């Protein structure tokens, strides 16, 4: 079966799991958990470029075929015509998509206010206080106190998942790849799901599928306990609605002042460089 590949990236705690649960209602679409496809492609490419064995007798056409086959082999067990691969680094790797997968990438990017993302992480850590989250483990290893301010600073540090995702997402703008990216605002998705999904299908150039936003099911669960120390990191409620608190109810003035108004994608008209 010939398969079309689309991509999900964007920011954490911005509804990507919810969004994939909606897309999975379409019988033609497969949206699995986070994928290692890009990493496998990257490290295979690095091997061919640096390995003594590969350099001693280079076969560039065969190297290209091997890397190009990664995504087909990874999804060989999926019998659906449209595959949605999730990796937060796709916007920073449009060139690899074009070189090895398709010349016309379509990357779906759920996004959200940065302070809402931080507030969501803090609430989740508090809900799972009987576990040691990946955030608290990093702080303990570095000798920092387990305060909410420190948690937010870690998430926004170069080692933190929020900053890393912002960087990869921002590189899509820096490389003039906006035309390959469709942004899905979290608050639009939960407040106006049908209108938001119609825009998604229009971007994908697929016929619209009528979704049931009151009967959602998360099919592909990640090992959140083992990997993140947060048992409900990728939970999806059956009925679509917004239940999170406002950031002002969760975060300190220090965090609110430091990380407000970072949503560059709402005002970017040209390549940007936030990460100098």
Regions inferred by a protein language model and the residue ranges of each:
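PAPS-dependent sulfotransferases, especially Golgi type II membrane carbohydrate sulfotransferases
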Residues: 1-6, 154-158, 166, 173-175, ...
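PAPS-dependent sulfotransferase catalytic core
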Residues: 1-70, 77-78, 220-226, 230-233
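Amphipathic alpha-helical recognition patches that constitute DNA-binding helices
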Residues: 7, 18, 106, 185, ...
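Pocket-edge structural micro-motifs
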Residues: 33, 86, 253
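A short, structured active-site edge motif that brings together acidic residues
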Residues: 34-38, 110-115, 212-217
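C-terminal/domain-terminus segments
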Residues: 36-43, 189, 265-276
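Short, basic, helix/turn surface patches
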Residues: 58-65, 136-143, 237-242
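PAPS-dependent sulfotransferase catalytic domain
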Residues: 81, 85-211, 226-235
């Amino acid at each position: 079966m010939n398969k079309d590949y689309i991509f999900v990236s964007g920011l954490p705690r911005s509804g990507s799991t919810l969004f994939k649960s909606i897309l999975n209602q379409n019988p033609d679409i497969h949206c699995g958990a986070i994928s290692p496809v890009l990493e496998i492609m990257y490290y295979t490419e690095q091997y061919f470029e640096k390995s003594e064995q590969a350099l001693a007798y280079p076969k560039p056409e065969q190297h290209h075929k091997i890397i190009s086959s990664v995504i087909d082999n990874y999804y060989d067990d999926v019998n659906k015509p449209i595959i949605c691969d999730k990796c937060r680094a796709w916007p920073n790797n449009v060139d690899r998509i074009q070189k090895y997968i398709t010349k016309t990438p379509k990357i779906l990017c759920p996004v959200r206010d940065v302070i809402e993302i931080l507030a969501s992480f803090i609430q989740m850590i508090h809900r799972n206080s009987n576990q040691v989250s990946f955030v608290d483990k990093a702080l303990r290893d570095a000798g920092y106190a387990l305060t909410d301010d420190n948690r937010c600073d870690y998430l926004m540090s170069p080692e933190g998942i929020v900053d890393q995702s912002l960087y990869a997402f921002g590189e899509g703008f820096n490389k003039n790849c906006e035309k390959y990216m469709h942004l899905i605002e979290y608050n639009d998705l939960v407040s106006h799901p049908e209108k938001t999904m119609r825009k998604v299908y229009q971007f994908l150039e697929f016929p619209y599928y009528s979704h049931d936003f009151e009967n959602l099911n998360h099919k592909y669960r990640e090992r959140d306990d083992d990997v993140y120390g947060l048992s409900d990191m990728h939970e999806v409620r059956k009925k679509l609605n917004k239940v999170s608190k406002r950031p002002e109810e969760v975060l300190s003035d220090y965090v609110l002042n430091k990380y407000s108004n970072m949503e560059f994608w709402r005002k970017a008209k040209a390549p940007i460089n936030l990460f100098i």
